[in-house]
Amino acid sequence: MIQPQTYLNVADNSGARKLMCIRIVGASNRRYAHIGDVIVAVIKEAVPNMPLERSEVIRAVIVRTCKELNRGNGMIIRYDDNAAVVIDQEGNPKGTRVFGAIARELRQLNFTKIVSLAPEVL
């Protein structure tokens, strides 16, 4: 469960390292965002000499959360960290690599480019 002011790791090589959520896209008064939701975030930590810089406002899709994800078949998935992938306005990832495992639910939400870049899909 991601809410405003939550810090997230970045799971791609776009140049950002840490994000802070400031808004959940598509929700006027939703409190929490889950896996597959798009958020507006500010970059809190970045790699030097990369296109993305600190204090830049970007969009990102959540790919991992510490809160459990319950599937219809009874499977429960929990990750060790909260992580997101930086995307552009069309929903394509800004980075060329994705690190770590991501959930299968992203494929159903039309983030197929992110799923194809991921090394492991759970």
Curated annotation (Swiss-Prot):
<comment type="subunit">
    <text>Part of the 50S ribosomal subunit.</text>
</comment>
<keyword id="KW-0150">Chloroplast</keyword>
<protein>
    <recommendedName>
        <fullName>Large ribosomal subunit protein uL14c</fullName>
    </recommendedName>
</protein>
<keyword id="KW-0694">RNA-binding</keyword>
<keyword id="KW-0687">Ribonucleoprotein</keyword>
<dbReference type="GO" id="GO:0006412">
    <property type="term" value="P:translation"/>
</dbReference>
<dbReference type="InterPro" id="IPR019972">
    <property type="entry name" value="Ribosomal_uL14_CS"/>
</dbReference>
<comment type="function">
    <text>Binds to 23S rRNA.</text>
</comment>
<dbReference type="GO" id="GO:0022625">
    <property type="term" value="C:cytosolic large ribosomal subunit"/>
</dbReference>
<dbReference type="GO" id="GO:0009507">
    <property type="term" value="C:chloroplast"/>
</dbReference>
<keyword id="KW-0934">Plastid</keyword>
<comment type="similarity">
    <text>Belongs to the universal ribosomal protein uL14 family.</text>
</comment>
<keyword id="KW-0689">Ribosomal protein</keyword>
<dbReference type="InterPro" id="IPR005745">
    <property type="entry name" value="Ribosomal_uL14_bac-type"/>
</dbReference>
<dbReference type="Pfam" id="PF00238">
    <property type="entry name" value="Ribosomal_L14"/>
</dbReference>
<dbReference type="InterPro" id="IPR000218">
    <property type="entry name" value="Ribosomal_uL14"/>
</dbReference>
<keyword id="KW-0699">rRNA-binding</keyword>
<dbReference type="InterPro" id="IPR036853">
    <property type="entry name" value="Ribosomal_uL14_sf"/>
</dbReference>
<dbReference type="GO" id="GO:0070180">
    <property type="term" value="F:large ribosomal subunit rRNA binding"/>
</dbReference>
<dbReference type="GO" id="GO:0003735">
    <property type="term" value="F:structural constituent of ribosome"/>
</dbReference>
